[in-house]
């Protein structure tokens, strides 16, 4: 073994250890409202709530995977205590499996080092910085699984065009991705087109047709299940779906959304200014140095875009740590755009042509289509939406790595870029801690406490979040089997999983604020059997809940009320007669 090989192995081991440390920190530390929401959705299904009938959640179509995990855990243990850690461990194992699968699939064309670095970036990345299977996480991971199944069928090699079951399995994964985040179904036509084009490369291939049939079967089966939950009353199902889709939070036009994004674009451009100047200087220096022949303008632009991605990755990593923020995902926008230009420049390259087409038609293009549709429909800020560009960015980076073995200095540059992408994903996870209220602090600033009871037992969170979990446990422990309403602006989804998982949810939605959603009142008129027996108020409420609290106390007979306190948390418990 040469000295160079030893250095490579040591660096690879260090990268693996860095990724493992980052994900272990994510596994045990931090608690965020959207992760709680994901588990509460699954819990509602486990406790007998039905989609659209008694669940009026905006993201209820993502409830199936967490419901399966919670059902398995409660069936084995008989309790929900510690279920959050179980779900996180399961997700971490699945991420590891997907990453190893990705590495084994692409190590031959990309090279071991490139494939390893990309797989580690894939392992460390989570869209919302927690491991729980919320709708965004499901959309990403099912998309990845679908691609890997399709890749296994179409990629050159001894198994090419063998095992049509791979296409069917990929279609099922794609359907779960669309179900988790329906806007991502915009990728479906491009997937179908890509499969059809790949089928044309060989006679008597029917991958596109099988994809279409599999999606139709999955969609039909899911529709029948929904209808069964509504008593096979199609008009009632359509009316309920229209009611839920008419969420006041999302009542904006395409023009209004475009105006909002345009206002936020200036800040994004300001962020990109310095890396863009550095990239231009690097390209200019390379041209003026006179080494080698001068590349064509298209290749110069490609080089500029990838240099820009490199410098922006460094900038995002530094500012994430310095500014104590998790929202510096701009590098994924740069990598996605650079990758798109690389696909364009290399479209006539003979080497790795099939692999390049796979990455483009089944990865980059569907990912970009899904992102544009999500961008139109989501409420989040422009810079936050860049998390949805990770998959196109990864496909673009893989396209860059496809040609790096032909030029040693380009190979080193590509590996340096991939290493920086790994650092950008891993270092903030090690240095920052997610806090209550979509904030974060450094590991030196945030004093984390171990949660010892309830569904989050065995994890650590900031003092406020940990105290609230303990307070919820103490407040709800006496009311096993009772329907609970949290009349709280910032819902605590894990609160419904207290009392060993015997509670039921007595409200329309766990995530839509009761202070701003008038459908909460309509819910009890349409479903009188869902009236609560226990109501919780948060004494440290961050929203104006006075009007809704007044409505509750006018429409429900309150027979008792008292306060439960634990550390910084204080809850009022109201008993309905």
Regions found by a protein language model. Give the residues of each.
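Perimembrane helix-loop-helix junctions
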Residues: 155, 187-223, 288-293
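Specific aromatic-rich, kink-prone transmembrane helix
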Residues: 139-158, 166-174, 197, 335-339
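Hydrophobic alpha-helical membrane-interfacial segments at the cytosolic entry of transmembrane helices
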Residues: 12-18, 203-228, 267-283, 298-312, ...
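Short acidic/glycine- and proline-prone juxtamembrane loop motifs at membrane-interface regions
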Residues: 131-140
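Membrane-interface alpha helices of multi-pass inner-membrane proteins
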Residues: 127, 163-182, 188-193, 216-217, ...
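Short periplasmic/luminal acceptor-recognition loop of GT-C membrane glycosyltransferases, typified by
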Residues: 57, 182-184, 188, 428-512, ...
């Amino acid at each position: 073994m040469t000295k160079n090989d030893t250095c490579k192995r040591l660096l690879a081991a260090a990268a693996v250890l860095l990724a493992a440390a980052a994900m272990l920190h994510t596994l045990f530390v931090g608690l965020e409202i959207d992760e709680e929401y994901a588990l509460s959705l699954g819990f509602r299904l486990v406790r007998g709530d039905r989609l659209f009938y008694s669940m009026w959640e905006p993201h209820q179509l993502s409830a199936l995977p967490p419901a399966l995990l919670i059902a398995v855990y409660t069936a084995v243990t008989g309790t929900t205590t510690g279920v959050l850690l179980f779900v996180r461990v399961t997700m971490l194992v699945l991420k590891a499996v997907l990453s190893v699968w990705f590495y084994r699939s692409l190590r031959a064309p990309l090279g071991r080092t490139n494939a390893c670095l990309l797989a580690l970036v894939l392992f460390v990345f989570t869209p919302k910085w927690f491991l729980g299977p919320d709708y965004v996480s499901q959309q990403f991971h099912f998309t990845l699984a679908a691609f890997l199944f399709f890749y296994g069928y179409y990629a050159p090699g001894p198994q090419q065009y063998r095992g049509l079951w791979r296409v069917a399995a990929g279609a099922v994964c794609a359907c779960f991705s669309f179900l988790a985040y329906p806007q991502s179904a915009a990728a479906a036509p491009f997937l179908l087109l890509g499969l059809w084009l790949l089928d044309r490369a060989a006679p008597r291939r029917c991958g596109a047709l099988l994809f279409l049939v599999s999606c139709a079967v999955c969609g039909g089966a899911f529709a029948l299940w929904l209808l069964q939950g509504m008593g096979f009353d199609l008009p009632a199902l359509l009316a309920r779906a229209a009611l839920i889709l008419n969420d006041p939070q999302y009542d904006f036009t395409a023009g209004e959304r475009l105006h909002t994004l345009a206002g936020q674009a200036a800040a994004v451009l300001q962020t990109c200014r310095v890396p863009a100047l550095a990239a231009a200087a690097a390209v200019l220096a390379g041209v003026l140095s006179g080494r080698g022949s001068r590349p064509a303008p298209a290749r110069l632009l490609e080089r500029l875009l990838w240099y820009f991605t490199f410098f922006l990755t460094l900038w995002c990593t530094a500012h994430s740590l310095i500014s104590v923020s998790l929202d510096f995902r701009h590098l994924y926008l740069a990598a996605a755009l650079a990758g798109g230009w690389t696909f364009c420049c290399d479209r006539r390259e003979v080497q790795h042509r099939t692999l390049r087409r796979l990455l483009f038609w089944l990865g980059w293009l569907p990912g970009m289509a899904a992102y544009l549709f999500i961008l139109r429909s989501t409420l989040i800020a422009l810079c936050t939406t860049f998390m949805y560009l990770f998959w196109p960015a990864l496909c673009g980076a893989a396209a860059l790595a496809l040609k790096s073995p032909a030029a040693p200095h380009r190979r080193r540059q590509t590996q340096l870029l991939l290493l920086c992408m790994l650092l950008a994903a891993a270092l903030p996870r090690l240095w920052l801690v997610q806090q209550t209220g979509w904030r974060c602090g450094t590991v030196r600033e945030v004093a984390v406490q171990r949660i010892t009871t309830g569904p989050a037992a065995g994890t650590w969170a900031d003092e406020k979040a940990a105290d609230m979990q303990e307070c919820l446990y103490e407040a709800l422990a006496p009311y096993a089997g009772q329907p609970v309403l949290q009349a709280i602006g910032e819902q605590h989804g894990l609160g419904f999983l207290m009392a060993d998982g015997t509670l039921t949810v007595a409200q329309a939605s766990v995530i839509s604020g009761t202070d701003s959603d008038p459908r909460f009142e309509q819910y009890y008129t349409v479903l009188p059997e869902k009236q609560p027996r226990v109501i919780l108020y948060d004494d440290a409420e961050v929203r104006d809940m006075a009007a809704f609290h007044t409505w509750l106390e006018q429409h429900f007979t309150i027979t008792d009320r008292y306060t439960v306190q634990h550390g910084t948390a204080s809850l009022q418990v109201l008993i309905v007669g």
